[in-house]
Regions:
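A generic structural motif
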Residues: 19-21, 90-93
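Histidine-centered divalent-metal-coordination microenvironment in nucleic-acid enzymes
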Residues: 68-92
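A structural signal for short, well-ordered beta-strand segments and their strand-loop junctions
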Residues: 12, 82, 117-121
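A short acidic (Asp/Glu
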Residues: 23-24, 80-84, 97-99
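Signature for HUH/AEP ssDNA processing cores
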Residues: 1-70, 74-75
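Catalytic "initiation/cleavage/transfer" segments centered on a nucleophilic residue
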Residues: 1-3, 29-32, 91-197
Length: 197
């Protein structure tokens, strides 16, 4: 992406749900293994739809500034399904990474999940020796960005085994060249116009 923009604003957030929101009524045991896995597969589709909704909103709000993004679906017994999301904005036009990440977290919590979501803004917790690839980065700092992005290629065996053969991705990246496309307005445009802009 540095080929398109020599300066990028790199944002990383974790998108999840409030505790208990994705949990089934019955806890897992050996007798309900199949039913539990079916429930988890249906929930994985729901969280993917929410991620798609957020990305559509980002394409509207940052249509001239969004250079690309990548996401990774993860699962653990406490957070249930959640997404790691890394966003790349044009560094010549955007510089306030913490504020932008906070706004994106607000979109996730208030609009996409209608109050059922939670979000971690990693840009707000940058420390001197961690998350060095976040914030405003130049082309000669690409290795720092790569180090921060390595979490996206770590294999999650539980998620991939549960979704195998289901034609559902656990990782994806998108590259958005600087040109804007014309087309019919998104259903989210009205929401953005009335709530966020």
């Amino acid at each position: 992406m540095f080929k398109y923009k020599p300066k990028l604003l790199v944002i990383r957030i974790a998108l999840r749900y409030k505790e208990g929101y994705l949990l089934p009524e019955d806890k897992y045991d050996a007798n309900n293994h199949g039913r539990y896995n079916k429930y988890l597969r249906s929930k994985s589709k729901e969280v993917k739809e929410d991620l798609d909704s957020l990305i559509k909103l980002l394409k509207i709000i940052y249509k001239n500034d969004l250079v690309g993004y990548m996401w990774k679906l993860r699962y653990d017994c406490y957070k249930q399904f959640y997404y790691q999301l890394m966003i790349f904005l044009d560094g010549d036009k955007c510089s306030k990474d913490i504020a932008i990440a906070k706004d994106i977290c607000g979109l996730w919590k208030d609009i996409v999940t209608q109050g059922n979501g939670e979000c971690t803004n990693f840009n707000a917790y940058k420390k001197p020796h961690t998350n060095l690839g976040l914030g405003l980065r130049y082309a000669d700092e690409r290795e720092l960005v790569i180090q921060d992005a390595k979490i996206f290629i770590e294999h999650d065996y539980f998620v991939s085994s549960m979704l195998s053969g289901k034609q559902q991705r656990t990782f994806s990246k998108s590259h958005i060249p600087g040109e804007t496309r014309s087309g019919r307005p998104s259903k989210f445009q009205k929401i953005i116009d009335t709530h966020y802009l």
